[in-house]
């Protein structure tokens, strides 16, 4: 199959079946496509849609982002995970204001210098918003290429990645680049999926090596799954009426800049902290433990509830410590486990 036929098959499929009504495809701009592409780096389209709508409603442009606080951005990102993405958006908005007078740049060399943006994301932003000729190589596109060309190897292998870039550069059409890129992403997301691909309806099936061999599972090679390490954390839930004591996390490992319950590596540390705050440890209530899965470890969370009859001098608010009100919540970023606990209190589970 020639490069032209490959791209034409993808374009024909896109015109008939491609996604054309996603929120970021309507009245699209460099800004809206940028936000969507950052969200989609680690998130499915289905999960990203409500967050995107809410984000654009609150931050319709670069200026509104610059006029906000990081806490406001993290608040709207809460629950989506991978919070560095939100921080990078906020940092980028400040850079764009300073270097480009608040206008999102339309030069590849400028876009790729923004935090959290690599070659593929920069190409996606320019091709999808302005139809500029820039190939993309996200996870969906990589999967299509290794199966179609029968390329054996790990996707993280730099030699494999270089080979895939050479291929996608050669088959991406100069005209209709945006539609081709969207078509490739859509085929990867809906047909050439990781498990049990729908090869019978794929527009590229006739010359796809994986389909001819009937061995789609061979491509790409999978990393040997490692058992994720287990970690334990103790949350101290300080509650006064409808208010909960939260502090901004400063640790580098997880949830930096998000507001959390006081957390400790073991129960002994937690009890020492309570004694320092003159809290009777006999009033502690053990809540139901649960776990939260990260990409690199599993965190077992043991919450301990303390109901305060009054607010003591140890719990005074400042910009890093607040009483979070369940009925009138402040606009701050919350990790998903903290959200989960607060939601359960809202439902009167505890």
Swiss-Prot record:
<feature type="binding site">
    <location>
        <position position="199"/>
    </location>
    <ligand>
        <name>[4Fe-4S] cluster</name>
    </ligand>
</feature>
<dbReference type="InterPro" id="IPR004035">
    <property type="entry name" value="Endouclease-III_FeS-bd_BS"/>
</dbReference>
<dbReference type="GO" id="GO:0032357">
    <property type="term" value="F:oxidized purine DNA binding"/>
</dbReference>
<dbReference type="GO" id="GO:0034039">
    <property type="term" value="F:8-oxo-7,8-dihydroguanine DNA N-glycosylase activity"/>
</dbReference>
<feature type="binding site">
    <location>
        <position position="202"/>
    </location>
    <ligand>
        <name>[4Fe-4S] cluster</name>
    </ligand>
</feature>
<comment type="similarity">
    <text>Belongs to the Nth/MutY family.</text>
</comment>
<feature type="binding site">
    <location>
        <position position="192"/>
    </location>
    <ligand>
        <name>[4Fe-4S] cluster</name>
    </ligand>
</feature>
<keyword id="KW-0227">DNA damage</keyword>
<feature type="binding site">
    <location>
        <position position="208"/>
    </location>
    <ligand>
        <name>[4Fe-4S] cluster</name>
    </ligand>
</feature>
<feature type="site" description="Transition state stabilizer">
    <location>
        <position position="138"/>
    </location>
</feature>
<feature type="active site" description="Proton donor/acceptor">
    <location>
        <position position="37"/>
    </location>
</feature>
<dbReference type="Pfam" id="PF00730">
    <property type="entry name" value="HhH-GPD"/>
</dbReference>
<dbReference type="InterPro" id="IPR023170">
    <property type="entry name" value="HhH_base_excis_C"/>
</dbReference>
<dbReference type="InterPro" id="IPR000445">
    <property type="entry name" value="HhH_motif"/>
</dbReference>
<protein>
    <recommendedName>
        <fullName>Adenine DNA glycosylase</fullName>
        <ecNumber>3.2.2.31</ecNumber>
    </recommendedName>
</protein>
<keyword id="KW-0234">DNA repair</keyword>
<dbReference type="GO" id="GO:0000701">
    <property type="term" value="F:purine-specific mismatch base pair DNA N-glycosylase activity"/>
</dbReference>
<dbReference type="GO" id="GO:0006284">
    <property type="term" value="P:base-excision repair"/>
</dbReference>
<dbReference type="GO" id="GO:0035485">
    <property type="term" value="F:adenine/guanine mispair binding"/>
</dbReference>
<dbReference type="InterPro" id="IPR011257">
    <property type="entry name" value="DNA_glycosylase"/>
</dbReference>
<dbReference type="InterPro" id="IPR029119">
    <property type="entry name" value="MutY_C"/>
</dbReference>
<keyword id="KW-0004">4Fe-4S</keyword>
<keyword id="KW-0378">Hydrolase</keyword>
<dbReference type="GO" id="GO:0046872">
    <property type="term" value="F:metal ion binding"/>
</dbReference>
<keyword id="KW-0408">Iron</keyword>
<comment type="function">
    <text>Adenine glycosylase active on G-A mispairs. MutY also corrects error-prone DNA synthesis past GO lesions which are due to the oxidatively damaged form of guanine: 7,8-dihydro-8-oxoguanine (8-oxo-dGTP).</text>
</comment>
<keyword id="KW-0326">Glycosidase</keyword>
<dbReference type="GO" id="GO:0051539">
    <property type="term" value="F:4 iron, 4 sulfur cluster binding"/>
</dbReference>
<dbReference type="InterPro" id="IPR005760">
    <property type="entry name" value="A/G_AdeGlyc_MutY"/>
</dbReference>
<dbReference type="InterPro" id="IPR044298">
    <property type="entry name" value="MIG/MutY"/>
</dbReference>
<dbReference type="Pfam" id="PF14815">
    <property type="entry name" value="NUDIX_4"/>
</dbReference>
<comment type="subunit">
    <text>Monomer.</text>
</comment>
<dbReference type="InterPro" id="IPR003265">
    <property type="entry name" value="HhH-GPD_domain"/>
</dbReference>
<keyword id="KW-0411">Iron-sulfur</keyword>
<dbReference type="GO" id="GO:0006298">
    <property type="term" value="P:mismatch repair"/>
</dbReference>
<dbReference type="InterPro" id="IPR015797">
    <property type="entry name" value="NUDIX_hydrolase-like_dom_sf"/>
</dbReference>
<keyword id="KW-0479">Metal-binding</keyword>
<dbReference type="InterPro" id="IPR004036">
    <property type="entry name" value="Endonuclease-III-like_CS2"/>
</dbReference>
<dbReference type="Pfam" id="PF00633">
    <property type="entry name" value="HHH"/>
</dbReference>
């Amino acid at each position: 199959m020639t490069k032209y036929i490959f791209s034409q098959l993808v374009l024909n499929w896109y015109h008939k079946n491609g996604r054309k009504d996603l929120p970021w495809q309507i009245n699209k701009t460099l800004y809206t496509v940028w936000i969507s592409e950052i969200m989609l780096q680690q998130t499915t389209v289905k999960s990203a849609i409500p967050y995107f709508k809410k984000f654009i409603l609150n931050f319709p442009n670069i200026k509104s982002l610059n006029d906000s606080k990081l806490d406001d951005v993290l608040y709207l990102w809460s629950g989506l995970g991978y919070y560095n993405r939100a921080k990078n958006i906020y940092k980028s908005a400040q850079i764009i204001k300073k270097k480009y007078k608040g206008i999102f740049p339309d030069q590849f060399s400028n876009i790729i210098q923004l935090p959290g943006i690599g070659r593929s994301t920069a190409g996606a932003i320019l091709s999808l918003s302005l139809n500029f000729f820039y190939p993309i190589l996200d996870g969906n596109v990589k999967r299509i290429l290794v199966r179609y060309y029968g390329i054996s190897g790990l996707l993280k292998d730099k030699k494999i990645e270089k080979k895939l870039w050479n291929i996608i550069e050669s088959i991406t059409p100069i005209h209709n680049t945006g539609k081709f890129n969207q078509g490739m992403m859509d085929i990867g997301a809906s047909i050439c999926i990781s498990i049990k691909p729908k090869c019978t309806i794929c527009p590229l099936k006739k010359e796809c090596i994986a389909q001819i061999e009937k061995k789609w599972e061979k491509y790409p090679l999978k990393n040997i799954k490692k058992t994720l390490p287990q970690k334990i954390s103790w949350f101290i839930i300080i509650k006064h009426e409808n208010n909960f004591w939260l502090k901004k996390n400063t640790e580098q490992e997880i949830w930096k800049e998000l507001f959390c319950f006081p957390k400790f590596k073991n129960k002994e540390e937690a009890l020492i902290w309570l004694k320092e705050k003159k809290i009777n440890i006999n009033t502690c209530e053990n809540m139901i433990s649960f776990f939260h899965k990260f990409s690199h470890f599993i965190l077992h969370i043991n919450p301990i509830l303390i109901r305060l009859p009054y607010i003591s001098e140890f719990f005074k608010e400042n910009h890093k410590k607040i009483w979070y009100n369940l009925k009138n919540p402040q606009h701050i970023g919350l990790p998903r486990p903290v959200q989960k606990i607060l939601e359960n209190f809202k439902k009167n589970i505890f």
